[in-house]
Curated annotation (Swiss-Prot):
Binding site for substrate: K168, S196, R253
Similarity annotation: Belongs to the MetA family.
Protein name: Homoserine O-succinyltransferase
Any Pfam family matching the protein: HTS
Signal peptide: none
Provenance organism: Rhodopseudomonas palustris
Entry's localization field: Cytoplasm
Site (Important for substrate specificity) residue list: S196
InterPro entries for this protein: Class_I_gatase-like, MetA_family
Length: 333
C-alpha cells in the first residue's frame, strides 16, 4: 500500500475509503514539481490494532504535511505472528519488507508489537528488528521508533536493557520539555501523551550512552528521547499516535481477558483518562467481576467517558510533533 497525500486532500486507501483508480491522493497542480517526502511505516501491531495504527499514522502525517507532499509506504515484519486473514491482507496491501533494500526513503516509522516472550532477544522478530535498525541507520535521514520498537532499537544499538515495571504504565501522562529541540517547537505545556507499556528505560542509562531525553513525565518517566548518528533516531516510550479511545479499547480487551481466564489479574484503569465519576463506577464493577468471574457481566460495565480535555490534549500534542518532524525532513537536502 503506497499512498501520496497532502494536507489539502483526503487520504484515499483500501483501509479508509473506497479506492480510486490508483489509490493515490495528489494535488495535480503541485505534485509534478514538488519534492515528495518518502516515509515507510513498518506496522508490527497486533491484528486487532493493525488497521487502527494505519489510520492513526496516516492522519498525523496528513495533518502535519502542510505544503509538502508525503508518500507513505507500508511494510510489516514477516515473523510477527498473524492470523491467516491478517496475513493475507498484509500480503495483498503491504510491500514486502525485502523491498526496503530497493526503496529510497527519507524516513521510517517503526511500531512496537505485542510481546510474546520474556525478553526481546527471545521474540521471533528479534533478528529482523536488528537488521531493520541497521538499515535505518544507513539509509534514512530520520526514523521514529515507537514503544517496544524503541526498546529493541536501544538494546541493539547500545546494549541498554529495559526494566520491567511493577505494574503496567497505562494512561495519559502530562509531560514536560527537558531539552530544547526543533521537534518540540510549539508543543503544548504540559504535553498529553498516552502510554501503554510493561517496561521502562531509565533516563540516566540513556544519557550515559549519549541519548538526549527531550520530554519527561513525572509519573511515566522518559517520554521522548533522541540519538544523532548517521540518521537521527527519535524514540517514543509512549504512543502519541493513539487516538482518544485507544487506551479505552485496550482496557476493555484486558477486562475481557480477565473474565474469560486469559489473564489472572484484573487490569487497572488508565491513569488520568476516565472521568472521576466513571472511575468510581469502574471500581465497583471490578469488585463485582473479581467476586463472580463471568464473561456475561461485561454487559453491566458502566458507560465510559473520558476526562474533559483529554482527546484535545492528545491530538494537539501529536499533531505538533509530527508537523515538526515533517518540517525537519522537508528542510534537509
Amino acid at each position: 500500500m503506497t499512498l501520496l497525500f497532502d494536507k489539502t486532500g483526503p487520504i484515499d486507501s483500501p483501509t479508509l475509503a473506497p479506492a480510486s483508480v490508483d489509490n493515490h491522493c495528489r494535488s495535480p497542480d503541485r505534485s509534478a514539481a514538488a519534492r515528495v517526502i518518502e516515509i515507510g511505516l513498518v506496522n508490527n501491531m497486533s491484528d486487532a490494532a493493525l488497521r487502527a495504527t494505519e489510520r492513526q499514522f496516516m492522519r498525523l502525517l496528513r495533518a502535519g504535511s502542510g505544503e509538502h507532499l508525503v508518500r507513505l509506504h507500508c511494510f510489516a515484519l514477516p515473523s510477527v505472528q498473524r492470523s491467516p486473514a491478517t496475513r493475507q491482507r498484509i500480503d495483498s496491501l503491504y510491500a514486502d519488507i525485502a523491498d526496503l533494500r530497493h526503496t529510497r526513503l527519507d524516513a521510517l516509522i517503526v511500531t512496537g508489537a505485542e510481546p510474546r516472550a520474556a525478553t526481546l532477544q527471545s521474540e521471533p522478530y528479534w533478528d529482523e528488528m536488528r537488521a531493520l535498525v541497521d538499515w535505518a541507520e544507513a539509509n534514512t535521514r530520520s526514523t521514529i521508533w515507537s514503544c517496544l520498537a524503541a526498546h529493541a532499537a536501544v538494546l541493539h544499538l547500545d546494549g541498554i536493557e529495559r526494566e520491567r515495571l511493577p505494574q503496567k504504565c497505562s494512561g495519559v501522562f502530562a509531560g514536560e520539555q527537558v531539552n530544547d529541540d526543533a521537534l518540540l517547537s510549539d508543543l503544548p505545556s504540559p504535553l498529553k501523551v498516552p502510554h501503554s507499556r510493561l517496561n521502562d528505560l531509565a533516563a540516566d542509562r540513556l544519557a550515559a550512552r549519549g541519548y538526549e531525553v527531550l520530554t519527561h513525565a513525572p509519573n511515566a518517566g522518559v517520554d521522548i528521547f533522541a540519538r544523532q548518528g548517521r540518521s537521527r533516531f527519535v524514540f517514543f516510550q509512549g504512543h502519541p499516535e493513539y487516538d482518544a479511545t485507544s487506551l479505552q479499547r485496550e482496557y476493555l480487551r484486558d477486562i475481557g481477558r480477565f473474565l474469560t481466564g486469559e489473564r489472572h489479574d484484573y487490569p487497572e484503569f488508565p491513569v488520568d483518562y476516565f472521568d472521576a465519576d466513571i472511575e468510581d463506577a469502574l471500581d465497583a464493577f471490578r469488585a463485582e467481576a473479581e467476586a463472580a468471574r463471568d464473561p456475561a457481566i461485561i454487559a453491566r460495565l458502566p458507560h465510559l467517558a473520558l476526562r474533559q480535555g483529554t482527546a484535545e490534549g492528545i491530538e494537539t500534542t501529536a499533531n505538533a510533533l509530527f508537523r515538526n518532524w515533517l518540517i525537519s525532513l522537508a528542510s534537509e537536502p
